[in-house]
Each structure stands twice: as structure tokens, then as C-alpha cells.
Amino acid sequence: MRIHYIVRPLALFCIMLYTVSAVSSDKYRWTDELVLLRAIDRLPEYRDGCHVEQFSSYDRTWGNDDGFSGKYSYLRKENGGLVIAEMEGAGVINRIWTPTPNDNMLSFYFDGKSEPGLRIRFSDLFSGKVFPFVSPLCGNEVGGFYCYLPITYARSCKIVMEGEGLQFIQIQYRRLPGMKVETYDGTFTDADRTLLDEVCRAWSAARPDAMAFAQGRSSGASVSEKTVTLSPGDGSVVFESGSPGRITGIELDGGNAFEGNDRNVILTARWDNDSTDAICAPVADFFGYAYGRPAMRGMLMGRSGYTNYCYLP
């Protein structure tokens, strides 16, 4: 079993974080949001001064018509189109999801302008054919069609679909009050293209690698490796540290020992002399097995080959 971790003075870290945040005065671009899609080291960071909200086709009567009829899939009809979302104030669209895309055109009207700043077929948000809406940030898997490409706006955004109908839809956005946000304009520098390519490579990595995320606040990671043999009823401490820091990755190679329905090997962890476990789960459950077999292989958690991995910091 391999544990990737870092040890560092957390007080200094907090001071550095505050200083960087306080002195930033540049406009917030879509690429500032894009870089967060690979900044796994920042997952534990609390966000303040923003609000995550969503437009969706949920049944306003709390029934089961969450998009089947299309009755709740838009806010209003306007000039022959359907207004499906309308956001006031600075913000960023983080996610668009649907299981039922169509080829109707979408128009994104930014900052109260009468002409759209972005026009694209609804289906091309997910097809991977239109830059920068490329795979794997945009695509379709079990569960529907998704787009995680950030779309920023300085003052407002209205999304209008041309056509008569729409079914299931979710549009998730984050309001950024008081921030100087640069509106997405569809122009891209060489640096923008390079960053997008780097994020796409991180999302599509063929093999999990903890050191790929040992950057930023997770840089300087060390590795602790231990081999254990467990008999029924036994337990073994595989990692222990008496200094502040963070675990940046857990890799556990157990062959096929965790397969099957028994789920009788338990992983536990606790921090800071707590009397209660922060983690207490069957190994199989922790790494995403289902019905006794490996069932998950994501960027941050799952199983690849015989390696069970978790890179949540």
C-alpha cells in the first residue's frame, strides 16, 4: 500500500493563501476557472463570496414531470424562442447537462447585449466537434450529455433556444458578486489553447498517477509504502504521521482480494487525535466497487488494473 503525503507548516500556508487572494486585481477570465478543473490540490479550499445556483427542468409541483413534457424546461417564450436561463450579475456557467440534446441553436446573450456572444447547436455543446467544447470536458457517458467548459460573463447572461421544445436540462452557474469578470468572447490565445489541452490530458489520463497531482499546494509529496498480510480479525497501521500536512494519494494493490460480496476488509482513518474515525468503510466501497466487482475508474478514485486509488487531498 502506498500513501502519498506532504508535511508542511499550515500557519505559513494560510498566510500565503490570504496574501495571494488579497492582492489579485486582474480580471477573472474563463481560463482562471478552467485551471481549477485540474487543480486537485485546491479541492479542500473553502470558497466564499460566491453562490452556486441552477436552472433546471424540475417539476414545480413536486411531481414526476422533470422534463418529460417540457412544461418546466424554460422560463418563458420570447421572440419565437425559449429562454432557458437568465442570470443577473457577474458569474460563470460551470456545467450544462441533458440526456436529451437536440440540434436547435442556442444563443448566449451576455451583459444585456442584443446580439449573442455565443451561438452553437445544443448538440455541439457535447459533440466535441466545436472548439473549445472538446472532449473529455464535454461529451456523453452513462447518465447523460455534459459540458464542463466554463463560460464567464461580467454583468448578465441570458440563454435562448430556438425551437418549439426542450426536455431535460440543468444549467449550473456560480454568481461572483463584486468580482471583475471578463466576459467570454470566443477568442483564444496560444496560452488559452495550451491550458485547455493540458486540462484535457489530465481528464483523459490512461493510467492513474498520484504524482500527476503533486503540484501547487500538494507539491513536494513524499511516498510511504508498506506491505501487510492480514489474517481474519487482524488489523494493521499502514500510515501514521505526527506532523501537520495532507494526504495527496492512497494506492492499494490487493489483486482481486477485495472482489466478491463479503466486503470484510475495512479501511479506517482519523486525524488530530479524534476519537471518531473520519473514514470507516469497506475497502471495496471506498474505491467504488459495486456488486462485488470494480465499477469506478475516474480521475480521482477507482481501480485501474489491480491498483485501487484515491487522489482526493
Please annotate each region the language model reported:
Residues 1-10:
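Bacterial N-terminal signal peptides that target proteins for export
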Residues 23-313:
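Beta-strand-centric surfaces of beta-sandwich/beta-rich domains
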Residues 13-23:
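Hydrophobic h-region of N-terminal signal peptides that target proteins for export
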